[in-house]
Amino acid sequence: MQKNHYQRTSNLTNTQKRRKKKRRRRKFLQFMGTIILSVLILTAVIFGYFIIRHYRESHPDDLLDHFRFNRADIILDAGHGGKDPGAVANDISEKDITLSISLKTKDLLENAGYKVAITRKEDTFLSLDDRASYANRKKANIFVSIHCNSSEDGEGKGIETFYSEYNEESAKNLAELIQNSIIEQTAAKDREVKTANYTVLVRTKMPSVLVETGFLTNETERSLLSDDDYQKKIAQGITDGILKYFDTIKE
């Protein structure tokens, strides 16, 4: 009897030892799993940080920043840019004129107390879809795209502003106010307000317009569009039209 009791006790002890060993192994594996997971998470965080840092350093003035979502009252879109020069005449590129006018307009609007975002602040390329998406993410009140015109015969002249029939009804009002205000400032030929279903007008979710500030292919207008004082007049006209628009929707 004593021998059998000893055998049972011995067997029980061996079973307990195996169970303890399994528990220790399980705890060890859980511990190692936690360590490995922590290392992977830390690596991902560090890797992500350097990716964002590299992007920010290589795009210091590119406001198409997917890591910012602060709201803006107004989006100004400087047409073309980077590999897309837009219209070109006598080595003068549309992308340079539109950027200069956009920056001048931005300063005027900010001085009037509005929060303004711009699709580009330097010579960078942005797709049309990116421009529209940026404006939508910013939840802006209005979107104004600034361009220069061209014609094959070089005779085209004047300023015109477009809105889309698929955009909000108030886009027409915005287009008319901006068009009239620019004409008042510049005394340029009034080509009036027209409809056009451009990508940036159709895919934006706020009243949106596109301003053609003059013809680069027209020698006289090309000279004017390259002049800093004339650009200021256009910028003032765009600003005046926007301010009048906001006055009308406040009434």
Residue ranges of predicted features:
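Catalytic-site microenvironment of enzymes
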Residues: 1-251
